[in-house]
């Protein structure tokens, strides 16, 4: 390349870098606050995650304001449809949780396509597990498997709903353990399920580790195993399913998304802000206090995980469509 061409190319690159820096520093349009739609009730895991991380994101972008609104219903479908059909102008963002995000349009008609959203940042990865009462006869996964085989179709388990990460985890577990289907009792979240478990109305709960970790530490519940690759540092005494000889990896991945077609300039700015927020020491400290197992992924990495989830569920749906149970 000639010296003149090198000079022009270098000048163009410098101008592009300057424009990017100015865009990152420019105030966010402040005609109204950014609405962050949480498709689940207040106080749940997705809601808590959103309210914890979003103030740190807005702090990175001058002029940006936000308000979190809860639009729950139909296991997240109502809120996800609102996010999907919002104008891609940066004034509407939302939260979601995989794999329920992918499962909804597979099992029923929905006004959104799971992979068409703009994926901004995943925040939490909370593994599924089996919670039992402290007086349960099941001391480990092997005990539960033996009981399921000895009493086919009699054991009862609770989840946070049909098509939830908990329910899909159970389908994978039954397949891996080669046990007859157990009796599924869906609830509208972990909050109403846990008292029923404590009261002896279900044999065990298939939920996330973080859902009842405080009760485990109080000695009111036990965890048989966690469906993670490694033991979570907040539950180091709980073996993984792989340690029990079962290849079961499942959990809830909670993150932030935008409507389809969010402009690249907006997406890049938000992704950069999330990258900083997810390293913030105050955020890390509070997440630990609230038993939030972090799994930070930004932009394309988050979308790639969502695509893997989509592919896995398509296979599961063909093998065992869960809307029937």
Where are these regions (language model features)?
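N-terminal secretory signal peptides and thylakoid transit peptides that target proteins
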Residues: 1-14
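N-terminal (or domain-start) structured segment
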Residues: 23-116, 179-203, 294-296, 317-325
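An extracytoplasmic/periplasmic, membrane-proximal ligand-sensing/linker region
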Residues: 31-33, 264-325
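Residue-level signal for nonpolar/aromatic packing positions in well-ordered secondary structure
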Residues: 34, 43, 50, 68, ...
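Short coil/turn segments
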Residues: 43, 98-99, 133-138, 159-164, ...
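Ligand-binding pocket segment of bilobal, Venus flytrap-like solute-binding proteins
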Residues: 72, 154, 158-162, 166-238
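Hinge/capping helix and adjacent helix->loop/strand transition within the periplasmic-binding protein
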Residues: 85-91, 105-192, 241, 253-286
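C-terminal lobe and pocket-closing loops
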Residues: 125, 211-279, 308-311, 324
């Amino acid at each position: 390349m000639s010296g003149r061409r090198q000079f022009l190319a270098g000048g163009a690159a410098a101008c592009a870098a300057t424009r990017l820096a100015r865009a990152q520093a420019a105030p966010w349009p402040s005609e109204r606050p950014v609405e962050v739609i949480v498709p689940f009730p207040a106080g749940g895991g997705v809601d808590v995650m959103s309210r914890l991380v979003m103030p740190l994101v807005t702090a990175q972008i001058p002029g940006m304001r936000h308000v979190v609104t809860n639009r729950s219903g139909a296991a997240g479908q109502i809120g996800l449809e609102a996010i999907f059909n919002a104008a891609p102008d940066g004034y509407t963002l939302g939260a979601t949780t995989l794999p329920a995000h992918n499962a909804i349009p597979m099992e029923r008609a929905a006004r959104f396509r799971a992979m068409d959203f703009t994926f901004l940042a995943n925040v939490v990865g909370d593994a599924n597990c089996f919670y039992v009462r402290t007086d349960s006869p099941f001391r480990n996964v092997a005990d539960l498997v033996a009981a399921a085989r000895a009493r086919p179709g009699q054991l009862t388990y609770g989840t946070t709903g049909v098509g939830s990460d908990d329910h899909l985890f159970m389908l994978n577990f039954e397949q891996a353990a080669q046990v007859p289907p157990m009796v599924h009792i869906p609830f509208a979240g972990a909050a109403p399920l846990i008292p029923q478990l404590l009261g002896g109305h279900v044999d065990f709960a298939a939920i996330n580790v973080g859902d009842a970790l405080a009760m485990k530490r109080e000695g009111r519940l036990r965890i048989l195993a966690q469906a993670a690759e490694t033991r979570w540092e907040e539950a180091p005494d709980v073996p993984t399913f792989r340690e029990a000889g079962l290849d079961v990896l499942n959990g809830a991945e909670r993150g932030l998304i935008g409507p389809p077609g969010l402009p690249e300039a907006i997406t890049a700015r938000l992704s950069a802000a999330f990258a900083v927020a997810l390293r913030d020491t105050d955020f890390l400290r509070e997440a630990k206090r609230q038993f939030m197992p972090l799994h930070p992924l930004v932009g394309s990495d988050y979308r790639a995980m969502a695509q893997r989830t989509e592919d896995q569920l398509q296979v599961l749906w063909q093998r065992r469509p869960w809307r029937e149970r």
